[in-house]
Amino acid sequence: MKLTLLLIISFILFSNVVFSQKFNLFNFEQNHCLTTPELFLDECQLLNSTLPMCKGYMRVTYVSSNTYEFSIFNTSTPLCGQVNRKAGSNFTCDQSTNGVKQNYTGFSVTCISTSNESSLSSKTQQSIVFTVLLLSLALIASIF
């Protein structure tokens, strides 16, 4: 009985991780904005990048009334920072830390700061929490 329960939980965990990875890959391989500036621009492709580290995709997340958090995803680690949204639907992105202007599909932002710290996406965080909860349940089930 306990072995069957552990096998079921292991299968659920494995499926969750695989689905999460495929879902993220699907989102970041898009060639266009999946949302509009009014919908907080979930994923957009970077265009006209001149720096190798800036080539990739940007995810923008709502933080407060005029502030959005962003991660630039490339083949290595994402660049993380904060952005301030300006009025209107057309924006320009000025990466002041690098002295380079980057234009993004459908919108742009002012990059306040960037770093090489890796950030976990919300889906990855949800996957980790889900995994920990299931492992806790498995541990409790094995005790009783």
UniProtKB/Swiss-Prot annotation:
Lipidation feature positions (GPI-like-anchor amidated serine): S119
Annotated keywords: Actin-binding, Cell membrane, Glycoprotein, GPI-anchor, Lipoprotein, Membrane, Signal
Residue positions the entry lists as glycosylated: N48, N74, N90, N103, N116
Signal peptide feature range: 1-20
* Protein topology in the membrane: Lipid-anchor; GPI-anchor
A GO cellular component term found in this entry reads: side of membrane
Family recorded in the similarity comment: Belongs to the ponticulin family.
Q: What task does this protein carry out?
A: Binds F-actin and nucleates actin assembly.
> What is the protein named?
Ponticulin-like protein L
Primary gene name: ponL
